[in-house]
Amino acid sequence: PCSLIYPWNDEIGLSNARCLPIVYDLIRDKLTDQQIYLAEKTIEAYALQCEERLDKLDFTANPGDSHAGRVPAYMGDAALILKGSAYVKEEVLMRWLEKALDIYGGIFPFFGTSDGGWAEGSFYSTSYTKWYLPFFLAVERFSGFRLLDRPFYQRVSQFFLHFAVKGRENHPFGDGYWCSSEDPEWPGFFAQNPFRVYAERFGPDLAKRWEREQAAPE
């Protein structure tokens, strides 16, 4: 039921693939050898499912699948965090890392067709511009290469100003729904301040102000 590659709902698997490598990195020093083995083989299993899903879709040629758009970062996180593992082959880690970097250095972010803009639209953008940030920032920290220097990332906080501010009514791309802090959907889709990182680095003064004032999720 937690698989990323079977026809049933993949949300649990996506969350596991995202969180397990990062949590493991934080607690590894507290684990026994057996626990390290189990954790690393579980992370490997999820990263292999990420890779299989991308390969089956031929993602670089067909990047429109929303959920698949999350997993290159999770695969990249696994590659970085498992570096030096005694249980996962280095050539496998290098393959995952190269695929993630090819996607984020090549076709990403992908754009929609008839909507004429970013494929995920306004509602999903509050979360879908966050999934890859841990991987981007790790690459930047360890290599100095800034994936965030692309124009999309430099300007996305200006896009948020049109709808991700209290009282704004502009819902582009036909989404028609916005999530406020009182909404039950808030924890899932607005789990993080959408201005964070983007406004801090690239935003105009108004975006930086809203980054500071945006209500924190409960």
Where on the chain are the PLM-derived regions?
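Carbohydrate-active enzyme catalytic cores, enriched for enzymes
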Residues: 82, 124-218
